[in-house]
From Swiss-Prot:
Residues 107-128, 148-156 are extracellular. Homotetramer. Homomultimeric and heteromultimeric association with KCNJ4/Kir2.3. Can form heteromeric channels with Kir2.6/KCNJ18. Associates, via its PDZ-recognition domain, with a complex containing LIN7A, LIN7B, LIN7C, DLG1, CASK and APBA1. The record marks D172 as: Role in the control of polyamine-mediated channel gating and in the blocking by intracellular magnesium. This is Inward rectifier potassium channel 2. The lineage of its organism: Eukaryota, Metazoa, Chordata, Craniata, Vertebrata. The modification S-nitrosocysteine is found at C76. GO terms for molecular function: inward rectifier potassium channel activity; phosphatidylinositol-4,5-bisphosphate binding. Residues 129-140, 141-147 dip into the membrane without crossing it. It comes from the Eukaryota. Residues 384-427 are annotated as: Disordered. A motif (Selectivity filter) lies at residues 142-147.
Length: 427
């Protein structure tokens, strides 16, 4: 059955190699490629990369170093770990050296470095710079070996011990705070939040919709998760002003609240292409020749730390598959639901998808087919059910009284009550 289904439906797989989009053609006017990211000819640079990093470089920034030093804490949190460790070590070593020099100068001015002098020293057992440096370390780290200690002979030495103790506490608080803030950053949480490689455009509830899929690879939830999307493209205003990247919001249900999602299993985000959509006048051919980028954003609070994280990705116009839907990944088992992430990036082709724009579709310039075809989601569900039954030792039926359409594709006789068949327009 699986081999027959492959011939019947066009599958875009991230696990298969090859690029056949430019060479293969099908009845409804577009090809079928098989690659990790299904694209046509590359036509523009990304503003937001697939991994979420912004493809932007800042040049000719005045007083950049001073501005970064003015916000030193944020700078320490944002820099790489290797530089953070360098700052961590330098902060302590330089403070020890500074106060070691101070105690050595106190001993030098008081004459404690003269071994023949019998008067009471400001700091006992400090008769060299090495001894002063060790005393500085013992004071700031409160080691206290007992050989070197400050006396009441020099008030300035007593003051410096107190001052170094305060400075040491400040350094500890700053460095430890920066390290903890860097460790608690939710940036790495984005590694377990994934977007589909391609976006798709297909009919849903009688309307053309732009869709993409998001998934959470962890069992821990993303609290208050919500999605946003923007279309980026260049344009020229009526006054002749050129805007290199005009940002246009794409409605994903903000007004109705459906932009807030419960991200336990992969969810398909839907943008209805209506009269307020920037894609309203674009047909399949227009999408093929368009030059724009759709930035998708997923935001939410990490359940473990309650810190807000933001995961980003983008789709160029050549990464939008017209007339495709995503393969189902959620299957119902006896006592639980199963998510198959091997199907996460895969799509299948819907042959009767209109190629016109949403405007032409709304103005009845394109007549939708009323033919009822067997829905691919139902076939995948039946296949999953058949595999589970075969594992449990349930024999397949040998009845030949099957409908002609299902008989051609070797459909197994599976009870349909738990999984009622749905028409393609009902998905």
């Amino acid at each position: 059955m699986g081999s027959v289904r492959t011939n019947r439906y066009s599958i875009v797989s991230s696990e298969e190699d090859g690029m056949k989009l430019a060479t293969m053609a099908v009845a409804n006017g577009f090809g079928n490629g098989k690659s990790k990211v299904h694209t046509r000819q590359q036509c523009r640079s990304r503003f937001v990369k697939k991994d979420g990093h912004c493809n932007v470089q800042f040049i000719n920034v005045g007083e950049k170093g001073q501005r970064y030093l003015a916000d030193i804490f944020t700078t320490c949190v944002d820099i790489r770990w290797r530089w953070m460790l360098v700052i961590f070590c330098l902060a302590f070593v330089l403070s020890w050296l500074f106060f070691g020099c101070v105690f050595w100068l106190i001993a030098l001015l008081h004459g404690d470095l003269d071994a023949s002098k019998e008067s009471k020293a400001c700091v006992s057992e400090v008769n060299s710079f090495t001894a002063a440096f060790l005393f500085s370390i013992e004071t700031q780290t409160t080691i206290g070996y007992g050989f070197r200690c400050v006396t009441d002979e020099c008030p300035v030495a007593v003051f410096m011990v107190v001052f170094q103790s305060i400075v040491g506490c400040i350094i500890d608080a700053f460095i430890i705070g920066a390290v903890m803030a860097k460790m608690a950053k939710p940036k790495k949480r984005n590694e377990t939040l994934v977007f589909s490689h391609n976006a798709v455009i297909a009919m849903r509830d009688g309307k053309l919709c732009l869709m993409w899929r998001v998934g959470n690879l962890r069992k821990s939830h993303l609290v208050e998760a919500h999605v946003r999307a923007q279309l980026l493209k260049s344009r020229i205003t009526s006054e002749g002003e050129y805007i290199p990247l005009d940002q246009i919001d794409i409605n994903v249900g903000f007004d109705s609240g459906i932009d807030r999602i419960f991200l336990v299993s992969p969810i398909t985000i839907v943008h209805e292409i209506d009269e307020d959509s920037p894609l309203y006048d674009l047909s399949k051919q227009d999408i093929d020749n368009a030059d724009f980028e759709i930035v998708v954003i997923l935001e939410g609070m990490v359940e473990a730390t309650a810190m807000t994280t933001q995961c980003r990705s983008s789709y160029l116009a050549n990464e939008i598959l017209w007339g495709h839907r995503y393969e189902p990944v959620l299957f119902e088992e006896k006592h639980y639901y199963k998510v198959d992430y091997s199907r996460f990036h895969k799509t299948y082709e819907v042959p009767n998808t209109p190629l016109c724009s949403a405007r032409d579709l709304a103005e009845k310039k394109y007549i939708l087919s009323n033919a009822n075809s067997f829905c691919y989601e139902n076939e995948v569900a039946l296949t999953s059910k058949e595999e589970d039954d075969s594992e449990n030792g349930v024999p397949e039926s040998t009845s030949t009284d099957t409908p002609p359409d299902l008989d051609l594709h070797n459909q197994a006789s599976v009870p349909l009550e738990p999984r009622p068949l749905r028409r393609e327009s009902e998905i």
